[in-house]
UniProtKB/Swiss-Prot annotation:
S-adenosyl-L-methionine binds at S187, C220, P221, G222, G223, D239, D259, D276. GO terms for molecular function: S-adenosylmethionine-dependent methyltransferase activity. It holds the Pfam family RLMM_N. This is Ribosomal RNA large subunit methyltransferase M. NCBIfam families: PRK11760.1. It catalyses: cytidine(2498) in 23S rRNA + S-adenosyl-L-methionine = 2'-O-methylcytidine(2498) in 23S rRNA + S-adenosyl-L-homocysteine + H(+). Catalyzes the 2'-O-methylation at nucleotide C2498 in 23S rRNA. The active site is at K305 (proton acceptor).
Length: 361
């Protein structure tokens, strides 16, 4: 297959396109992008047949900022007959053998999601035919490739596969999180999603545990503080504004009515630093850099608000500058990840982990 299909948020196709063009080039996989505004997907068409397999194997999905999910894809199947959509799809997947799962999806747009009921019903007979053809195993297997069938409109679909070790575990790349009734704001879901995105399940018990000390800069009214409290942490909530009363009643939160840019922790035993402030992204990055250089935290999750134009260029420039500044100031052992999360809008979420191979005292 020569196409790479990438899911993204509607309105961010240009950013996703610019990113995959650059990243594919770094792997010497030439091609060009096909993208339309508000389609919520991008297709990277490789010049060489089967080059998409190189990308789904060698380009880590977690290293892409704007793509939620990706798969090696066929050319667009069009005019699928209403009386037999299955046969052309099975034929297009003839080179896929012994996959462990099939997902029938749509892009994340209101128009495409009108097909979601059809996709659910269609999955059952399609699964049976794929098992008969040998493209799909009789039993689901999480270690085998995943077959993707993405309907972008009635009778129009891209089909292909991803590898389970380089694929989102979520349908359409979207985690299904529930808004807690007592959470102070919807922003709470951003940190909840970020923990799932940046900290593997098997490491969460060690790295996100009860009793840890944390700081929330720009905490009011407490959406992110809520997620820290829910996980049993003690939180220094820094904001001139008021905090949610129920959060304060837990006894786990100490409210500092201060400017988040001027606050300095009294004790240097902070594991998690979180920050979701409506500020210029470069200024927030400088703040996190200062905390990192001072060694005031172990892991940080923070949001960078995106400009209206050149969003990919701006984000990559800020992240490159951050890494340069940290290294110039003696902080050389760290890991940075960045993702445009489902619950993000005009922002991206960044994870910075200092000394990832060194235990926390």
């Amino acid at each position: 297959m020569k196409n790479l299909f990438l899911f993204c948020r509607a309105g961010f196709e240009k950013e996703c396109a610019a990113e995959i063009q650059q990243r594919a080039g770094e792997l010497n996989v030439g091609g060009f992008v096909k993208a339309n505004n508000n389609d919520a997907y991008v297709v990277y068409q490789c010049f060489e047949d089967d080059a998409a397999d190189t990308l789904v194997k060698q380009l880590p999905l977690d290293s892409l900022i704007f793509a939620r999910q990706m798969f090696a894809a066929s050319d667009l199947l069009v005019d699928l007959p209403e009386n037999d959509r299955i046969s052309p799809i099975v034929a297009a997947l003839s080179d896929v053998s012994k996959a462990g799962e099939v997902r029938v999806e749509t892009p994340d747009t209101n128009e495409a999601k009108e097909l979601s009921a059809f996709c659910r019903k269609f999955t059952v007979p399609l699964r049976q035919h794929l098992k008969k053809s040998g493209s799909l195993l009789a039993q689901e297997n999480p270690k085998r490739p995943i077959i993707h069938v993405c309907f972008i409109g009635p009778g129009r679909a891209y089909v292909g596969y991803s590898y389970s070790n380089n694929s989102s575990p979520h349908f359409m790349g979207i985690p299904r999180l529930k808004m807690a009734a007592d959470a102070p704001s919807r922003s709470s879901l951003k940190l909840d999603e970020a923990f799932g995105q940046f900290v593997p399940k098997e490491e969460q018990e060690e790295r996100i545990r009860s009793g840890m000390n944390s700081v929330d800069l720009g905490a009011c009214p407490g959406g992110w503080t809520y997620q820290l409290v829910r996980r049993g942490m003690f939180v220094s909530a820094v904001d001139n504004g008021p905090m949610d009363e129920k959060l304060m009643e837990t006894g786990q939160v100490k409210h500092y009515r201060e400017d988040g840019f001027r606050f300095e922790p009294q004790r240097k035993n902070i594991y998690w630093l979180v920050c979701d402030m409506v500020e210029k992204p470069a200024r927030v990055a400088e703040l996190i850099e200062a905390w990192a250089i001072n060694g005031w935290f172990k892991e940080a999750i923070f949001n960078l608000k995106l400009p209206m134009k050149s969003r990919y260029k701006e984000v990559t420039a800020i992240l490159e500058t951050m890494q340069t500044i940290l290294k110039e100031n003696g902080v050389s052992d760290f890991k940075v990840q960045c993702k445009h999360l489902y619950h993000d809008r005009d922002e991206v979420t960044v994870h910075l982990w200092l000394r990832p191979n060194t235990a926390w005292n």
